[in-house]
Every structure is written in C-alpha cells, then in structure tokens.
Regions:
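Extracytoplasmic
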Residues: 16-19, 24-27, 37-41, 55, ...
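Histidine-acidic residue clusters that define the catalytic metal-binding segment
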Residues: 2-22, 158-197, 229-234, 360, ...
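An aromatic/glycine/proline-enriched structural segment found at the starts
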Residues: 1-14, 169, 193, 198-263, ...
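Acidic/histidine-enriched segments that form metal/cofactor-coordinating
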Residues: 79-187, 235, 334, 348-372
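M16/insulysin-pitrilysin zinc metalloprotease superfamily fold
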Residues: 71-74, 102-136, 282, 302, ...
C-alpha cells in the first residue's frame, strides 16, 4: 500500500447565503432557504439581555428563560408536547439578547411553531414552577462555582465594571434569591410577550409560508423598542491589581488575567480575534507553548475576547499547581509584552488566516450553525454579508495589521489578575511579583 498522503485539493470557496427578510406586523422574519435540509431551525431574538436588567431584578432574564420551558400548561409540559412533532426547544440568554427557538422537521414546522408561540407569548408562569426553577438555579450556581475556573470567571465582572456587569449574568446567589414570581411575570409581559422580536428561520423552506410563521409567532406584539446603550464605568482601584478568591487548602489555582475591551461594533474583528488566537486561541499559541509545552505548568492555556454591544472584555485563563501560580501570571504577562513588542511570525499569520477561512463550508453546513450566525447578526446589528466581510478581513490580514492589533487591543498595564486558590499560600508570592496591590476575598462576599 502507498505510504504517502494524497495531495490536498484546492480550498473550497464559500459565500454565506443571502437571507430574505419579511416584515410581519411588528416583527421581522429573517430566513435562509437550504434545499434538502429537512431539520428547520427557528430562533426568536428579543433585545432584552442581561445588560439592560434593572439592578433590583438581576437574573430575571435567566430565570424567565428557564421558566418558559414549563410551557403554557406548566410543570415542564413543553418538551413532551414538542416531542410529539419531533421538535426540540432551545432557550438561552446572554448580555445582549434573549433567544428562544426550536428545531423541527420541515413537514411538522407549522404544528411545532404554534406550540412554540404559546410557550413564548402565553406561558403558564405558575408561581410554584418559578420558585422551583429559581431554587434549581441557586443550587446550580454554587455547584458550578465549585469549579475553580468557573468561580474565577464569575469573580471577574466586579473587577472590571460597575453596574449590571459587576454581577454574573444569572444574577448571583443573593440577587437571584430576591426575584419573585411577580417579578418574572412583569418582566415577561413587558419585555417578551408584548415585543415581537426577530424570527430567524433556516432550512428547506419549500412549502413553508414565512408570513404565516411570522403571524403565528408575532401575533399583535409591538415592534422592538430602541435600546439605550451606555458604556459601564469601571470600579475604583489601582491597575494592574490582583484579587485572590480564597479556597483554603487548594493545591491548584485558576487564573484569569483580563482587561476591558471595546464593544463589538468598535473592533476590527479579524485583527482583534486574530491576535487573540496567536496569543492563546490555538494549540500552538504563545501561552500554550510557554505554560504547557516549555514550563509544564498546565494542560492548556487560552485567551479570547468577549465582545458585547456596549463594551467588551479580553481575558487569558489557565489552571496550574499552587506553587507555580505567581510564575504563571508573570510568564503570561511577559508573553503579551513580547507579542506587543516583536509582533507575529509568518507562520502565525498563516495559521490565523487558514483557521478562519478554510473551514467555513463545514462551519456553516447545518441549519443550526446558519441560524446561530443570523442570530449574531440580529443581536449586533450586523449586515447580511457579515460572514463574507469577516472572511475577506481574515484573507487581507498582514503581519503589519496583526502587529498593530497587538498594541491596539492588548493592554497588560490595565489588567486585573483574578486567582482562585489558597490565599495563605499565594498572597506573598503574588505580592512579590510587583504586579500591583493584592486583595483577598471570600467567595460568599463577592455578590452581596
């Protein structure tokens, strides 16, 4: 048998399908026809994410999203009803949007959508269901926070922002516990039931009447109101600085090194995400090669941007043994400084280009992935050809453009270092790094 690999074929070109838009009452249907794709994905986007929650109702988005799954009849009735049509419910909340949806066979879409519309517009919202879901979320919060990496990420908001972003998306244990069934009902009536939103539909649309789908989902709901946006202020305090979230006796530490970043609309995405990939977004990234391959401190280290409508965050993260914590922090910051000073290599440039262009036909090969891209466009007011523009931006990347991105988007001098670990063991080594003042907090005191 031959022992050589067959030659690689030419890279397939890719263009994101152009969506069609249909205005129906107070809402808009955004659809992509994919002939032969018999599993249709529908997503309803409301612009009421966690960022616009009032401070006395933090977490109401997440709790309402959970409660909708109880359906119009309550007591977790929605999933079995949808299953009779081969459909599956989905719901999620982020800082900028409240997204509900379903995946259903094309020949059962109409029946499934009627159930979906009832669940979104006319849910039971039984007080017992709301209290049950709230208690489940509270229990889940601390179960998830038992993982050091999760606790570190949830501790980050209050170090970078004041206002809503200072508390985790789910509201934190104290704020979430204060939400009553009446609060959920009021939020749902004002922000979900009475607001049409945008309906994303992707799949084989032969025989599917988009206008009728829109009428079923939107009903007489009003159009989406304008959202007021303002950049949240940072908390007081010296930068850079270190926060230790104390876990006595822990033999490992979870690290997050982060700083504020521009909003989604303010960044050149290929340049910003490209330089993040060089630093920590690939196996061959600078952080992984240093902390994992050379020093042997971790199984993996990474970095990425979290870009929102009104602000953003850049962060690096890893988990290491306690005794290597301080050196891991300084080594990570040194990698950023070196990247800002010396720039990227030609090999890194090629890797960034190829990883964000070659795989696009596979990345957008399913109705769900196409729907996800359309939801992103709706949430961030992106043009219909956003994916193609983004691909072209990656293809245009040069060493010079990535080098300038390193100095424009990476700011270690503004960083906050969050370490979850044994404070007694970590305080002095982290103080000795000279990064900045070191504060120690107990996890239960973070979200009072």
């Amino acid at each position: 048998m031959p022992q050589t690999r067959p030659p690689l074929g030419a890279v397939a070109s890719y263009s994101f399908p152009k969506p069609q838009r249909v205005t129906v009452g107070g809402g808009t249907v955004v659809a992509v026809d994919v002939p032969g794709q018999q599993l249709v994905s529908l997503r309803l986007v409301h612009p009421h994410g966690g960022a616009v929650e009032p401070l006395d109702a933090m977490g109401v988005n997440v709790l309402t999203s959970e409660v909708l799954e109880d359906g119009p009849d309550g007591n977790s009735s929605l999933a079995p009803a949808l299953e009779r049509h081969g459909a599956e419910w989905t719901s999620r909340v982020n800082w900028d949007g409240f997204i509900t949806g379903l995946d259903a066979p094309a020949n059962r879409v109409n029946e499934a959508v009627r159930l979906f519309a009832d669940a979104v517009r006319r849910p039971a919202l039984n007080p017992d269901d709301i209290v049950r879901r709230r208690e489940q979320l509270l229990e889940r919060f601390w179960l998830e926070a038992a993982t050091a990496g999760t606790l570190a990420m949830r501790s980050l908001g209050g170090q970078l922002f004041t206002g809503r972003y200072a508390t985790p998306l789910g509201g934190g244990p104290v704020r979430l516990a204060d939400i009553t069934p009446e609060t959920v009902a009021s939020f749902h009536a004002e922000s979900i039931a009475s607001v049409a939103g945008t309906l994303v539909v992707v799949g084989d649309l032969d025989g599917i009447d988009l206008e009728e789908l829109g009428k079923t989902v939107f009903g007489d709901a009003a159009s989406v109101p304008e959202r007021e946006s303002s950049v949240p202020a940072p908390p007081p305090g010296e930068l850079p600085r270190v926060l230790i979230v104390d876990r006595p006796g822990s033999v490992q530490s979870a690290l997050v090194i982060a700083h504020r970043a521009p909003s989604r609309s303010q960044v050149d995405l290929p340049r910003a995400e490209g330089i993040s990939e060089v630093l920590g977004g690939m196996f061959t990234s600078r952080l992984n090669m240093e902390l994992r391959e050379r020093l042997g401190y971790t199984y993996g280290a990474g970095s990425r941007f979290d870009l929102r409508r009104d602000s953003g965050v850049f962060f690096m993260s890893t988990q290491v043994e306690a005794d290597t914590t301080a050196h891991s922090v300084t080594s990570s910051l040194e990698q950023v400084a070196e990247l800002r000073e010396s720039g990227v290599t030609e090999e890194e440039l090629t890797a960034v280009r190829e990883s964000n262009t070659v795989g696009l036909p596979v990345s957008y090969s399913t109705a769900r992935s196409l729907a996800g891209a359309l939801v992103d466009m709706v949430v961030h007011d992106l043009p219909d050809d956003h994916v193609d523009r983004n691909r072209a931006g990656y293809e245009r990347l040069t060493k010079e453009s990535l080098d300038s991105a390193a100095t424009e988007y990476l700011h270690p001098e503004e960083a906050v270092v969050v370490v979850v670990g044994d404070a007694e063991r970590l305080r002095q080594p982290l103080t000795d790094t000279g990064i900045g003042p070191v504060e120690v907090r107990d996890p239960e005191s973070l979200w009072t």
